[in-house]
Each structure stands twice: as structure tokens, then as C-alpha cells.
Amino acid sequence: MPSLTQTRSTVSELNTSAIETSTMSDSGHQNKPKGPKGITFSGETFIVPETHDMVKTLFDPTIKKSNFELIILGLLFSNLLVFLIPNNNLRISIFIGFYIFWRLSYNFGIGWLLQHQSNDHLLVQWAIKYKLFDKNNKNFLAKLVQSEIKSQRGDAYDINSYPIEFNTWLIFRKFVDLILMSDFTTFICVVYACSINNDYQFIKNQPSWLTMSRIVGGSILILFNYWVKVNAHNTIKDYAWYWGDFFFRQINNEELIFDGVFEMFPHPMYSVGYVGYYGFALISKSYIVLLTAIFGHFLQMIFLHYIENPHIDKIYGPSKNEINLIKILKLKDLKNFDNLKPLVGLYNFNWMRASDVINLVLSLTYGLIIPVFAKSLKSLFVLTVATKLFESLSINILLILQSQFKFFTKWSLSNDIPIEKSLNNWAVLYNSLINLTYSSLFGLNLGYFLQGTGSSLVTDYFYLRLFLGLCLIYTQSWINLSIIDSIGYFGWFYGDFFIPKSQSSIKNLTQAGVYRYLNNPEQIFGVCGVMGVFLIHPTVENLTCCILWMVNNFVRINFIEKIHMIRIYGEKEVNRDSGVTKTVKKHLIPDVIQRKMSNDDPKRRGGVANGTSLGDSLDNFIKELRNSTTKLSQQKLIELSQNLSFANSNYKLSIDGLKESNELKYTTIGTPITVSWQSPSNTHSIRDWVGLYKIVQTSYSRNKTILSSAGRWTYCTDSKGVFTFEKEKLFWEEGVYEFRYHLDGKHDVAYISEPFEIKSVDIDVPGDISEAGEFSKQLKTEIFDKIIDIKSINESIAPIANQADNVIEVYKLFSSLISKSTQINVNYRIFLNNDNLSISDVAHKLIDIKQVLQELSFNSSEKKNL
């Protein structure tokens, strides 16, 4: 689409030169102070004025308050009126109601607005629809909005000299200020009301040392929370704090920032950014405050998952090539596990896999059956310890033997077992033993519950211990999933112990995902779930198990895994500083000591970072309308064609090479389509363009196209011309299509071609292997030649397909066309899993499949006749 090309060009110029692009927006700001450059999603550039955070804006007496800010302050202080009510329990109920209202307004109100702003630019569209920033609009709402902006920015601020997107963001900020400040204020009111309840219960009914410990511990959490917020704001500024990237982009801010607190924790504003809430709960000694904090934090994580993360992926996500590489690596990862996701715990369970069923039976036996029939808790404890010791010794010894002597690999090769199979066998053994240990631990605690035996160490604060224990268990589960997501199943099952580095797709240790923050996340969080079990049920037996788990985890990581990693990847690669270490050094350790302690190699700092450009990111904002499920009749499609509306037009489009049929003219999938155009020479623009579209997606309008052409277009530089649409400029699916002639780089339609159909070619699979040669040539001509340039039916497909930007999509296209053309389903993984596969091999596979299907059909019908 031409407009996207222009936007990319503008962004490229702004990113690669210090000279400002001479756009209309910039020319209006030449005399203004320089600041960060912004660009709207329509391509308009401007200088982003300085703004202040909500606390400074609302509470700094030196800053003039806007109209909305005065209203916000009034609403905040109005909460104090509730304290005039003498009944404190009623106050608590009222404040909780207020908090729920503001929290829902935050996560679902702001969330809804941001989601639609991200997908549809809703807020900006409202501003345009109601002309909120038009000086000539005398509507009350427009005057109110313009008055608010003037009161924010001053009378010298020229509203029309800034994009609508920026002005809309300024108004949206006040809406955010109201909700966020009200949310926090009502929560503090809940904390205070609960603390003073029952004659200041938060400092009574406890030993003084415990009370002081609560207050100090809670205060530390609150101060840490404050530092997180301040550091985060100093890092990302107002632009990201107020979700500015939902409205416009800042030049040279095309990548996510990993600095300060963002280098220590994933999504710190949503994760550790709420620990202060739990600090308030600790100080107030109130389960009501704790539940309120959990409620607010839970809703915030929902907001992160459904609103923030999708937008982050859309704007800052990896490029198409990086996504493609990740997909390939994950699929290649499964080659070591029979192309199926291996069992981790009981995750990825498959009833058709015998090892999975055996794992389930053993887990149920150790976790349920044995505890139910056990005569004493001592026997359960001995079983748990024995199982853990057996797992620890056997796994550790095997890893040492494999690392030092390649014991497992030599045994596999001597028995003619491929090394990939040896890793799969190891994975089954490793996971089975891990499952036994955790099942035994679960069975031990189930035995306590069934026999009604209480804790022998601590009996108080059960609900608090339950909450903290469940949090630790969840943390271990989440960390494990994050580790798998970062290093794959290959890394989870110690794949680099079994597969040579030259044959592995992993050449370096990852610094992505959870490993961005910690070098060894499993060392800290790998057994925190067992600590959680002890916290919930603090017995001597559980304490012993907890220590046993921790010691084994420490030994395995530091004396087995780390030594092997250093041998393979090098000491500098293994010992380089994690995000947490870097931040602690930066803020707490003097520079002189830092330089002596640093593990970073200076040569590393010259490396090129893998990132996405703003131009690539903007691709995600050219919205595609979804394919309609409405089925249109052929006659209806003809009625929708341009020929009935522009019969006397001076513009013409004609399509060459279409085949005749009883209904619409047609061509086959992948066949190049040549289109000719004709336009009046006196009005022709070199920016006129022709695009290819599916009719069911453009039937809403014959005069304007609002759907992205997704690259299927070409400029009409001359008033008459011919262009052949082929390969990436074609649709590779069946349907009814049309060409549209657009004027002057815009989306106004001057002419629409006759509708035509794209069909799958029909290829008959022979039943005799002797015909494989001719069949291979037919596959090459009708399918493969349309997608890749392959010379021979015996040439490997992979090296040529890998030259494409997205090899996964190429393989999927192969399988789709073959399946539709031959009526035999073929999975794209046959191309991915065999680098030497040729067209001839594909032909033989199809013939073999047909022969098997014919035999099965024959036997089936034969049985019916008996």
C-alpha cells in the first residue's frame, strides 16, 4: 500500500539522519524547543512537548493545575468525608466498594479503551468524528476539551499545530490520572480503616518483636515498591507510563527498554510493582487488606495479559524473520523427541504414548494409593526421602558419566540407537524420576491430612501461610514454563549433554526470556515450590525434604551443569552478568569495584543487537479485515463487479490468460496473472496504483478501499501499461477476486475489473510406482515451480526454500497446495524434518499413501460384502 511505503520512508529518514523531515507538522515547530520526535501511525511527525508525571502534576504547588486536575483533586479529597461516619466497619465496606469500582474502571475501563485504540484507533476516531480539536466547533464538549488542553499547556499552545493523536493522548492522560489516583487513594483508605479497627488492632495482640518485624518488613516492601515505580518512570518516562505508544511512536524508541528495574524483573510495573500492596497488608495485619491487594494484583495481571502484552507484541515484537527463526528452532527442537512435545511433569500428556501412561500410573500410585493404605507416616517419610535420594544420585551420576565419558551416547550408538533417540530416552527417564519424587512428597502431605496430624513447628496464621505457600508453588511452575519457553525442551532435558554442538541448533547460551534477568533462575526458584509446601505444613519431615531438595539442586547446578556449560560455551559466556547483577552493581557498588568484579568482555559490547525497526513494527498497524464466512452466489459476485457501475468510465482494467468456464473465468493457484490498465493521459498520476483483492472482503464499498493490499499492488507510472502479478503478489488460496485501480496514491477507486476465480489445479496421483517420474514432473510444473526456482525433481527442496523470508509459510503452502490438488493430506513437517527431501521423494510418498488408502478401502468394502 503506498501510504505505508511513505510512512516507512519517513521513519527511515528520521532514524538515520539528524536532519528533520520537512513535513507540514515539523515546519510548524521549527522555532519551538527541541525534544523527542514523534510520528503518528499515519506518518505525520512532530516534536513531543515536555510533560510531567501525575504526582508532580497534581500535588506540586508550583505547577498550575488544569480544569480536570482541579476536579481530580476535589474527588480525591472527598474520600475523607467517609471518615465522618462513626461506624468503622461501615467505612471499610464503603472504601472497599470504592476501590472495586476504581479498580474495575482501571482494568476494564482503561483496558477496553486501550484495546480498541490499539486495534481501531478508537479514541482518535472519536476525536475526529466529534471535531473535538476544531477551533470552529462551538459544541460544548469540543469547547470543554480545548479549554482543558489550553489549561494544561498554556494559552500559547496551538492545538492545530499538533497531531490529533497527541492532543487525544493529553485528554486520555487526565482520565488515567483520575482512575489511578482514585484507585490508590481508596486502597490507602482501606488500609488505614482496617489498621485502626478494633482500637488500632495492627499494634495489638502480638509480641512487640513481631509487631516491629511486621512494620519494618512492610515498610521495606513499600520503599522497594516506591523505588521500582520511580526507577521505572525515570527509565520509560511519561510516554510509556501513559501508554503513549497506543497513540503515536517516538523516533529512536522502537525497541523495548531493558534498563534499571526493567533489567531486573519482567514487567516490573505489574509484578514487583505491587509488592507495596502486600507491605501495607503486612503492616495493617488485616486479611481484608491482603485479599484486596490480591484482588487488585490479579486484575492487573489480567490487564497485562489481554491488553498490554498483545500491544507490546504488535509494536515491539520480533520481526517476521525472527519469528520465523523461533518457529523453526522450536520445531527442530521436537526432532529429538519423535516430533512430539515431551512429557514435563504431567504437562504435554498424551494417552497414545506408553511412557506417559506409565508416568501417570506411577504418580497416582505414589501420590494417592500408597498414602491411603499406608499404616504410618514414618513409612511415607522414608519412601519420600529414599525416592529423592535415588533420583538425586542416579541423575547426577548419569550426568557426570555422560559429561565426562559420553556414557549414555556410547551405549545408544553401540545398540544402533540414533543420538536423537538417546536424548528422548534420557528425557523419559529424567522426567519419570522427577515425577516420582514430587508424587512422594505430595503423598507424604496427603498422609498427614488423612491421619489428621497437625504441624509440629508452627500452627498460627494458617491462611497467611497458605497464601504464601501457594504463591511459591505457582512461582516454581511459572519459572519452569518460562525456562522451557526460553531454552526449549532441548535445554530443559540437558540436551547439550547428549547432542554435539555442531549438530545442535543452539550455538550460544540464551539471554532472552527469564534468562535476561537471572543466569540460573532454577537455582533460586527451582525448588521454591517445596519451600511453599513446608510453609503451608511446617513439619520436621517437610523441612528435611526441603533441605534435601535444595542441596541436590545446588549441587546439580553448580558442580555438574555449570562445569559442563563452561566446557562447551566458555567461562565468559556462562559467568556473564545477569540483569539483576548489573542493576545491583550499578546502584549499590562503586564504579572502581564494579570494573574489578565485572565478568563482561569489552569485545561483547560492540556486538550488534537483534531488534526490530520502526518500519517493520508499523506493518502490524495496517489492519487486515477478517475473511467473511458469508457465502455469496456467483450471480451476486457478478453484480458486485465494477463493470455494472463504471461501464462508461475512461479507466479500464483487463486481465489476460483467464480460462473460460460455465460461471466465472478462472485461473489456478500460483499461476501468474497479467493485468493491463488504461487511464486518461491528461489526468493520470504516476502515483496511480492497481491492487488485487478478495471480493468478499471489499464488497462493502465500490468507491473506496479501506483494506490493506498486503503488498499485492503496483504503481501505474504510465497511463497505459501491463504488469504481471506473481508469487508474493498473488493470493494463494481459492476464492473470487478482482483488481482495483486507485487514484494518486490514495484509496479512491476509479475502476474495478471483472471478477475471476482462483482454483486449485487437479492432479491425479498414480497408483503405480512406475509412473513416479512423470508424476514428479507434474508436481514440479503445477506446484513447486510456482513457489520456488528448483531445477530438478531430484534436487533437495530445503536449500532453495530456506532462501525465502518465511520458510515455514513456504512449507505450509507446499502442503496446502499438494493436499488440495491431490486430495491427499500432507503435513508440512515432512519438508521441515528432512533436509534432503526432493520432489521425487514427495511423489513417492504420495503414491505410497494412495496405495495404502486403496488397500484399506478395498479391505473395508470386502468385509462389507461378506
From Swiss-Prot:
Keyword Lipid metabolism on entry: yes
Database matches in Pfam families: PEMT
GO CC annotation: endoplasmic reticulum membrane
Spans within the Lumenal topological domain: 1-65, 115-175, 229-263, 308-353, 401-425, 475-523
Intervals, Cytoplasmic compartment: 87-93, 197-207, 285-286, 375-379, 447-453, 545-866
Coiled-coil ranges from the UniProt annotation: none
EC supergroup of this enzyme: transferase
Keywords of this entry: Endoplasmic reticulum, Lipid biosynthesis, Lipid metabolism, Membrane, Methyltransferase, Phospholipid biosynthesis, Phospholipid metabolism, S-adenosyl-L-methionine, Transferase, Transmembrane, Transmembrane helix
Gene Ontology MF term list: phosphatidylethanolamine N-methyltransferase activity
Function summary: Catalyzes the first step of the methylation pathway of phosphatidylcholine biosynthesis, the SAM-dependent methylation of phosphatidylethanolamine (PE) to phosphatidylmonomethylethanolamine (PMME).
Name of protein: Phosphatidylethanolamine N-methyltransferase
Native source organism of the sequence: Candida tropicalis (strain ATCC MYA-3404 / T1) (Yeast)
Gene: CHO2
